[in-house]
Amino acid sequence: MPMQQQSRRLASAVALLSLASTVVLLSISLDAAKAQGVKPILEPITGKEELGDLSQPQQALAQFYRAFNTRDLKMIDENFAHSDEVAIDNHLGGIRRGADQPHVMYEGVFKSPADVHVEFWDYTIHRAGDVFWAVGRERGTYRDGEGAKPLNIRTSRIFQLIDGRWRQMHHHGSIENATLLGEYQNAVRSAASKSQ
């Protein structure tokens, strides 16, 4: 068999093995989710819940939403890991990486008169060892001038168990409605620039 043909077969075999491995890994995740009976939780997390010792995923989520809705930067800092591996990707700040970025981003939101309030709902929680991730939706309002406007965001948050407490490592948020996205960005950014 010519060398070129052997190389093609080897490349094809490697590609198939890689594809099969990916399918198996995805199947394991899907099977694990099915085994956990993952159904969306519709009862919202508002931040008014009992925080307890922050050893449970829902407590860590409640801590974040309490910090956000009460404009508590110290609590935001406590909720996020103190690690340069922290990453945030959302409609206000783009992709931000580093231990100080949650503080910087949320400080801008909190200084804004847009007065954003949200709750987390229609979510699932998934856990693998020292990591859990929550995937769901945020709904709430923000102020634009004199009136309140609705806010709907697809959201995911990843936490890592560090010294017995869940610390947020990653947040991603997306606003599907392009008009709403533009209005929200303008309200928060213009208000934040006026307050500086």
Which ranges hold each PLM region?
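Hydrophobic/aromatic beta-strand elements that line small-molecule binding cavities or substrate pockets
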Residues: 106, 120-125, 138-140, 154-160, ...
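Short beta-strand edge/turn micro-motifs at domain boundaries
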Residues: 34-39, 133, 152-182
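Short, cysteine-centered beta-strand-loop-beta hairpins and adjacent loop/turn segments enriched
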Residues: 113-115, 140-150
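Short, low-complexity N-terminal intrinsically disordered segments enriched in polar/charged residues
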Residues: 32-79, 100, 187-196
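A short hydrophobic beta-strand element
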Residues: 130-140
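Bacterial N-terminal signal peptides that target proteins for export
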Residues: 3-18
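A solvent-exposed, acidic/Ser-Thr-rich amphipathic alpha-helical stretch
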Residues: 51, 55, 73-128
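C-terminal segment of classical bacterial N-terminal signal peptides
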Residues: 21-32
